[in-house]
């Protein structure tokens, strides 16, 4: 029998998560203020998202992330569908203000991440994974054994804190079979199967991560509860016969069209009454907070094709795919869980 994975940490690592999740926040301010003079122009002309994109020559996904981050920081406010520069932004981030901090942030504008943000805003193409020089984009790098092993381990370690919190809020009592879609190491499948009587789980991953998952599940003594199948979530139909689908820290890697595709595939594979569980960092209904989630979304925007989604956005996407009985609950370390039933 392996370790009890259902026990949470004895001390609080919340701030440690926030340092890592918000690592790129200052670089996004530097890129906007110095490369685009964003706040000076917005102060003279409030704009909606489409107008921001046209005026600054930027794309909707990164612009949406940027505006949510600025709103959470009290630098923009949304009124009547348009974004306005706040008094704070006017005083400290416009070029003609005597208290302008643009020269202060200009000392950061040559940082690699700040330069990446300028490119990402203009092209909507994520940068390479920041810890690896001369690497392929993240989605391609995950097909290589070395990168996949390191990345999977990085994501796996969070599960010892986030998994028990997910278990408390997921509402899986009485469920029998869970499919952990793009489940990485299988840590969340292991926690949920250990902590839910009668539940068995299957991790769906593409090579080489499927092999990594088998090894890690075996090391945790969970091979009797959790199995692994290989597959591509975008090319292959999802396996049938499960009454729970789990997307844990998956949807934030993808833009809306691919999120729609994944939710539709889930709906196609689930029988009525089955449950979808989306464990992630979610923005609020207005997409102007929580602050730390908007900062994390900036990091995700820079290295993946996705971002953090708002609770309202997820409700609409799930309803469109054929799910109802929407429920939202906070879990741990700025993460949360959304559940919905297949109609």
Regions picked out by a protein language model, each given a short descriptive name:
Residues 2-6, 14-41, 54-55, 61-176:
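Conserved Class I S-adenosyl-L-methionine-dependent methyltransferase catalytic core
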């Amino acid at each position: 029998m392996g370790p009890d994975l259902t026990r949470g940490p004895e001390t609080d690592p919340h701030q440690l998560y926030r340092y890592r999740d918000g690592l790129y926040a200052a670089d996004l301010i530097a890129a906007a203020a110095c490369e685009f003079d964003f706040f000076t122009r917005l102060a003279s002309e409030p704009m909606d998202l489409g107008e921001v994109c046209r005026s600054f020559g930027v794309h909707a996904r990164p612009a949406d992330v940027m505006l949510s981050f600025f709103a959470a920081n009290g630098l923009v406010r949304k009124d009547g569908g348009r974004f306005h520069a706040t008094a704070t932004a006017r005083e400290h981030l416009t070029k003609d203000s005597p208290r302008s901090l643009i020269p202060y942030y200009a000392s950061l504008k040559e940082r690699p991440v700040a330069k990446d943000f300028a490119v990402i805003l203009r092209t909507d193409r994520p940068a390479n994974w920041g810890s690896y020089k001369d690497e392929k984009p993240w989605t391609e790098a995950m097909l290589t054994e070395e990168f996949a092993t390191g990345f999977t381990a990085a994501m796996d370690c969070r599960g010892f804190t986030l998994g028990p919190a997910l278990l408390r809020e997921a509402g899986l009592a009485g469920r029998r079979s869970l499919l952990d879609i793009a489940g990485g190491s299988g840590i969340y499948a292991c926690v949920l199967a250990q902590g839910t009587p009668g539940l068995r789980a299957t991790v769906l991953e593409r090579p080489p991560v499927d092999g990594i998952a088998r090894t890690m599940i075996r090391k945790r003594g969970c091979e009797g509860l959790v199995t692994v199948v290989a597959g591509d979530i975008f090319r292959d139909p999802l396996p049938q016969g499960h009454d729970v689908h789990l997307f844990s820290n998956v949807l934030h890697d993808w833009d809306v069209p691919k999120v729609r595709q994944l939710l539709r595939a889930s709906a196609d594979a689930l029988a009525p009454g089955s449950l979808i569980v989306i464990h992630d960092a979610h923005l609020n209904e207005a997409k102007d907070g929580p602050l730390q989630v908007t900062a994390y979304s900036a990091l995700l925007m820079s290295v993946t094709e996705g971002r953090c989604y708002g609770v309202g956005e997820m409700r609409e996407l799930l309803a469109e795919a054929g799910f109802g009985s929407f429920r939202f609950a906070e879990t741990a370390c700025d993460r949360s869980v959304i559940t919905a039933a297949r109609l």
